Amino acid sequence: MGKLFGTDGVRGVANKELTCELAFDLGRAGAYVLTEMHKKPKILIGKDTRISCDMLEAALCAGLTSVGADVYLAGVVTTPAIAYLVKSHGFDAGIMISASHNPYEFNGIKFFNSQGFKLSDQIEEKIEDIILNKKWDEVPHAQFDAIGRVNRVDLKKDYQEYLKSTLNGASFKGLKIVIDCANGAAYKIAPEVFEELGAEVVVINNQPDGTNINKECGSTHLKMLQQEVVKNRADFGIAYDGDADRTLFVDEEGNIVDGDKIMLLLAQNLKQQGRLSRNTLIVTVMSNMGLFVAAKELGIELEVTKVGDRYVLEKMLEGGYSIGGEQSGHIILLDFATTGDGILTSLQLTKLIRESGKKLSDLAKIMKVYPQVLVNAKVENGKKDLYSKDPVILEAIKKVEEKLNGKGRVLIRPSGTEPLIRVMIEGEDYEEIKKDAEALASLIESRLS
């Protein structure tokens, strides 16, 4: 992982860290690196609903076309839609402008290769090298008759039809579902798909205004969805984040069903159908201890990776596994998609719920959740790795681990996308671990500020 590209593309505060100039440079360098593989690359661009997306899109277009690439603008679509459409429509690369679940002032630029996978580290490093070391002499401007063109395309329907095709004719008639679109990229795509499948849909947070994406809504703020599910007497609720690469559910009683439970239910279903590749589910270190206990009882093997869907995907591709994901609702179903797809995941789980004939609250009993507390310590990006060398912080962590005595764990993890260090503690006594997590986060902030 380099200086520009984080775990999920290039990300930062729009017009401050992620500027037009940087977007233009990413377009130029990206198109040049891709022209080494394709004479005149065709590049598909999508965006979420942030106010800064139009600005960054224009800068990217200028950079890409100046090197001779042809650009196709898909408008507001989800990140997984770009990944799917790049491959299905024969584009040479895709770019998504989004900062996913982050607040609206952030934005990001994420590249996909022609197969719909995120760019390899090697290609990201080539792009980075040109920009950071100002190797613009290597990047020629296109001859005036070879400048790229910008085209607008509407491919949403193709993606929606593909999503429905993964369900083998299932109908959601008779189901009442509340969908929280996070005022983000799924605000039209998701409700339309569920309605076309026969569900009665109550939609919330589907009025994006450029500044309300993820604001007190979506998969990172589930309170409104919980209330609406109970109020509307719905069968369950579904929440997406800003670019719909993740999803979480709420059962009919208003309880949260997180990514751990969702992927365990889907893995168990695949196992019953004989489709769980190598009988294994890929999870991250953030998954709850309850998942490990339940998987063992169900006879499902687990492989554990670092946090970040790119690490989950790497492990899946390496071992030929079919399902993996994160507690946050980032779930990859490799039989159908090359990246985490919130709408796809929610359709598959809805099909499972419908076919089981059970309530989601009953299905969610598949695992017992151990109390888990996550507290964020605000630390500048450049100082995030220093915690592991600070003797005072290390001693404090050791003391908490001794107190847990094998019946819990402490996980300290710098965020790959934000200026934060995440402190996660799991144990049997919620109040106790909450106190310890807050104390550790506070110590980290004071030591590294």
Swiss-Prot record:
Co-factor: note: Binds 1 Mg(2+) ion per subunit.
HAMAP family reported in the protein's UniProt record: GlmM_B
Family in the record: Belongs to the phosphohexose mutase family.
Modified residues annotated as Phosphoserine in this record: S100
Gene that this sequence comes from: glmM
Positions with a binding annotation for Mg(2+): S100, D241, D243, D245
Keyword Phosphoprotein: yes
Record's catalysed reaction(s): alpha-D-glucosamine 1-phosphate = D-glucosamine 6-phosphate
Catalytic residue list: S100
Top-level taxonomy: Bacteria, Bacillati, Bacillota, Bacillota incertae sedis, Caldicellulosiruptorales
Protein name from the UniProt record: Phosphoglucosamine mutase
